[in-house]
């Protein structure tokens, strides 16, 4: 399993923070944790609540990551298919997918 280079870790945090700022005003900040080939991303909401969102798996490219969604029902991350139909994609696609599920109010 590939270890994520420090430059890629830094780039990942920069990219996700920029995407959250422009696309998800409900997110006050992101917390990114790295271990081995994985990165876990949590959203910090304006009220201070921490919301686990995604787990990314480094596949050797800064633009193509495996995607796991946090499932509150089990407290675990499970590999998922992105809206593009792929199991892999950009970090921004993964963040958008999770935020659409967890932060958007349903239209009834």
What function would you assign to each model-found segment?
Residues 42-44, 50-69:
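Short, conserved beta-strand/beta-arch hydrophobic-aromatic motifs that form part
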Residues 1-48:
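Negatively charged, low-complexity tracts enriched in Asp/Glu with abundant Ser/Thr
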Residues 1-11, 69-108:
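Mixed-charge, Lys/Arg-enriched low-complexity segments
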Residues 17-19, 23, 61-73, 105-108:
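Hydrophobic transmembrane alpha-helix bundles
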């Amino acid at each position: 399993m590939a270890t994520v280079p420090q430059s890629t870790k830094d780039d990942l945090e920069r990219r996700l923070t920029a995407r959250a700022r422009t696309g998800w005003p409900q997110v006050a900040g992101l917390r990114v944790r790295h271990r081995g080939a994985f990165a876990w991303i949590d959203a910090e909401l304006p009220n201070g609540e921490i919301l686990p969102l995604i787990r990314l798996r480094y596949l050797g490219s800064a633009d193509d990551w495996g995607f796991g969604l946090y499932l509150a029902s089990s407290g675990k991350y499970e590999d998922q298919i992105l809206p593009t139909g792929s199991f892999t994609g950009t970090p921004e696609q993964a963040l958008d997918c999770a935020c659409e599920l967890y932060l958007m109010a349903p239209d009834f």
